[in-house]
A protein has these predicted regions:
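Extended, low-complexity, turn-rich repeat/linker tracts enriched in Gly/Pro/Ser/Thr and Asp/Glu
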Residues: 127-131
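Non-heme Fe(II)-dependent double-stranded beta-helix
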Residues: 1-16, 20-113, 117
């Protein structure tokens, strides 16, 4: 029995290789996490960028809390099992009206992990529309 996902969501992941949306954070949690990121940016006087954007969970308590969030881990466990390791994490901040985007891709091409049993948990921390 899945811990967080429905049996239908697990089946969709197994069939399609992805499943969305998955509710894991409430509005207060998102506000708090984003607030800590924005406070760091204000203190620094610039938006977060590399190298801090990569593996940020090693640098920031708020990012560590996010990658260890029980609902995220439960959803991941539902599709790959309980042996979970955070291998990589990148913050991708796309402000409104900017041309930034990420093309459809498969991380296994770049990570060289065997077996190819890994997932990406994309967590939105702002409202977004189709437009």
């Amino acid at each position: 029995m899945p811990k967080h996902l429905s049996p239908e969501q697990v089946a969709a992941y197994e069939r399609d290789g992805f499943v969305f949306p998955i509710d894991v954070l409430d509005a207060d949690e998102v506000r708090a996490l984003r607030g800590e990121l924005e406070a760091w940016e204000r203190d620094r006087g610039a938006p977060i960028d590399f190298p801090e954007k990569s593996k940020s969970y090693l640098l920031f308590d708020w990012a560590d809390r996010l990658v260890h969030h029980p609902k995220i881990l439960d959803a991941v466990e539902d599709v790959i099992g309980p042996d979970i390791l955070v291998y990589h994490s990148t913050l991708f901040l796309k402000e409104a009206h900017t041309p930034a985007f990420v093309r459809w891709h498969q991380d296994s091409t770049y990570f060289y992990l065997q077996p190819h049993l890994h997932v990406t948990a994309w967590v939105a921390m702002s409202d977004a529309t189709v437009q």
